[in-house]
């Protein structure tokens, strides 16, 4: 699972001559929605287009919208690839003359959600609109996020959901980010966000990038407790004597599995269950054979979550 990756994700930069008075916004958008993300919101996320992603969306419905958002990112991470070739194309140029609209350099168009699923690839706008469509199908309110970077003409877009007053950005891969975590993520990728805005219909809301959560030892213990319960649920017993050193009496073989995830700076307790399930899944996939007992330790060291699983048989 990739937790950090540098994207060359490009916002569709527009060069628009001021529309003539007789060209309404509706007429304009009907001609350029493939190249203008604000216009695309009404055209790509209508009921007809959203229904086309039903086969995938129904598989990603979670117990609530947080769970659905997590499952969507997980699916996108496993099934889609970033379209580097498309991202390298020049941005579209839109010219309006009276009621006539001409678009030049049309290769970097906005895909519909169903097209992105079919192609299995896209750029940031394609990921964002697919995420919004999958959320909408499952009855979850989604938002478009427009990002501007310092000293960079190239922008970026993503999706977001609101959970108990906090926006969480959904950007192609796990995990969901709170605003501060998203700011840190881009710093680590070599870019500094100058401004991020939530777009909700015709309303633009500045995103406060100082809002964030700092994971603590209490979070580590709570996650550890959840993961322990998952292992107990498989019938394997917990033995606190297992510590990777001398094998206690009653066992013939011991095994230690260590997992380091660069995700501590992005952790938020709103997604505790999803994090715990994800970590458990990663551990379970690495276990070969059957074991009688286990012990588990999870700690936070800087920006890293360290998980140590001791097994014995």
Curated annotation (Swiss-Prot):
Top-level taxon: Archaea
Coiled-coil portions: none
InterPro entries tied to this protein: Papain-like_cys_pep_sf, Transglutaminase-like_domain
Family: Belongs to the UPF0252 family.
Protein name in UniProt: UPF0252 protein AF_0384
Organism: Archaeoglobus fulgidus (strain ATCC 49558 / DSM 4304 / JCM 9628 / NBRC 100126 / VC-16)
């Amino acid at each position: 699972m990739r937790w950090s990756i540098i994207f060359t994700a490009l916002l569709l930069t527009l060069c628009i001559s001021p529309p003539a008075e007789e060209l309404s916004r509706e007429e304009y958008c009907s001609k350029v929605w493939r190249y203008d993300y604000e216009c695309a919101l009404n055209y790509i996320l209508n009921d007809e287009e959203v229904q086309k992603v039903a086969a995938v969306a129904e598989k990603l419905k979670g117990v609530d919208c947080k769970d659905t958002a997590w499952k969507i990112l997980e699916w996108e991470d496993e099934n889609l690839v970033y379209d580097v070739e498309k991202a390298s194309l020049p941005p579209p140029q839109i010219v309006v003359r009276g009621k006539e609209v001409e678009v030049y350099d049309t290769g970097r168009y906005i895909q519909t959600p169903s097209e992105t699923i079919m192609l299995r690839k896209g750029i940031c706008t394609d990921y964002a609109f697919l995420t919004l469509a999958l959320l909408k199908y499952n009855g979850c309110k989604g938002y478009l996020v427009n990002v501007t970077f310092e000293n960079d003409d190239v922008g970026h877009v993503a999706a977001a959901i609101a959970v108990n007053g906090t926006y969480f950005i959904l950007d192609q891969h796990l995990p969901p980010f709170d605003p501060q975590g998203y700011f840190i993520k881009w710093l680590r990728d070599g870019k500094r966000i100058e401004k991020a805005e939530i777009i909700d219909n015709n309303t633009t809301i500045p995103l406060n990038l100082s809002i964030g959560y700092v994971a603590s030892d209490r979070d580590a213990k709570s996650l550890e407790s959840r993961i322990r319960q998952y292992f107990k649920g498989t019938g394997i017993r917990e033995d606190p004597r297992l510590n990777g050193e001398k094998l206690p009496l009653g066992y013939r073989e011991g095994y230690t599995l260590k997992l380091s995830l660069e995700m501590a700076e992005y952790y938020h307790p709103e997604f505790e269950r999803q994090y715990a399930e994800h970590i458990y899944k990663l551990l379970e996939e690495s276990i070969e054979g059957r074991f009688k007992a286990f012990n588990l330790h999870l700690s936070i060291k800087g920006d890293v979550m360290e998980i140590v699983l001791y097994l014995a048989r």
